[in-house]
Design a protein with these regions (language model features):
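Hydrophobic beta-strand segment of the Class I
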Residues: 50, 123-124
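A short acidic, Gly/Pro-enriched loop at the edge of an enzyme's catalytic core
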Residues: 111-122
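Short alpha-helix
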Residues: 180-201
Length: 273
């Protein structure tokens, strides 16, 4: 699956990636798994170290690498060997045959990062934190690795109100980055409890029904895409296989998911002292 797949490209463009963004990275890095473009609002600067939680094929890592320039570092974290392998292949391939020199990828859980405390300028993530079983542990780990004054700029799914039972209990909705989400107020409170201040969570107004409209096109996954710790394990966030995608579409068609959930931009700063 790549930017050459119509569904993957449509989802990426619906959530903030421009044609130039997608053309500037290896096509296989875009797997149609987005709910926003965190690099667009992270204010990344040359020389910074940025970490992407749940990097998948490396889409946001490669975009971040261009912004921090060769003197900076872009680090991808993913829980599955398949995704790390894919990301490393993409990094070696690069664009126009020129490999990336300032990226690295690590196999790890996002609540147990293989990074030193106070070593990171910015943490980004795209439609992944909502899938974490212990979100508070993730928030604490982000705070640990950030430098004083460091920031997080995350694109995620959060709830405006509680989901209907049929949706919240359905694993397919979980794979679709919906049922794992928490209320916006709980997201805000969790970050503040982890020590972040200020915190701002903004509803982007993006249409979440795009998942149902394009998921069956973007779900060109291998047969083992649902064989791991969770169905998201090898496929990444927001990415059921084609058969599951059709079931997800049928489920979400019975509801206007925009009434319950939102694609949000999350900004938070670790106090300087």
């Amino acid at each position: 699956l790549s930017s050459e797949n119509r569904g993957a490209r449509a989802i990426a463009e619906a959530f903030g990636y421009s044609g130039d963004d997608l053309a500037s990275i290896p096509a296989e890095a875009n797997m149609g798994l987005s709910c926003g473009n965190p690099t667009a609002h992270a204010s990344l600067r040359p020389g910074e170290t940025v970490v992407d939680l749940g990097c998948g094929g490396g889409l946001d890592v490669f975009l971040a690498a261009a912004k921090v320039r060769p003197e900076g570092r872009a680090i991808g974290i993913d829980m599955t060997p398949e995704m790390i392998e894919r990301a490393r292949r993409n990094a070696a391939k690069g664009v126009d045959g020129k490999p990336y020199s300032n990226v690295e990828f690590h196999l790890a859980m996002i609540d147990k990062l293989p990074l030193a405390a106070g070593s990171v300028d910015c943490v980004i993530s795209n439609c992944v934190i909502n899938l974490a079983p212990d979100k508070q542990a993730v928030f604490r780990e982000i705070a640990r690795v950030l430098k004083p004054g460091g920031r997080m700029a995350v694109s995620d799914i959060a709830l405006k109100k509680q989901l209907p039972e049929e949706v919240s209990s359905d694993l397919l909705a979980y794979v679709g980055c919906v049922a794992g989400a928490i209320l916006i107020d709980d997201y805000d409170r969790g970050l503040r409890d982890a020590g972040f201040d200020p915190v701002e969570i903004i509803d982007t107004g993006s249409d979440l029904n795009v998942y149902g409209e394009h998921e069956t096109e973007a779900a060109g996954r291998s047969a083992n895409a649902t064989s791991g710790v969770l169905p998201i394990a090898t496929a990444g966030c927001c990415s059921p296989d084609a058969k599951s995608a059709r079931s997800l579409y049928e489920l979400l068609r019975r509801y206007n998911i925009n009434d319950y959930a939102a694609s949000v931009k999350v900004y938070a700063i670790k106090p300087a002292n």
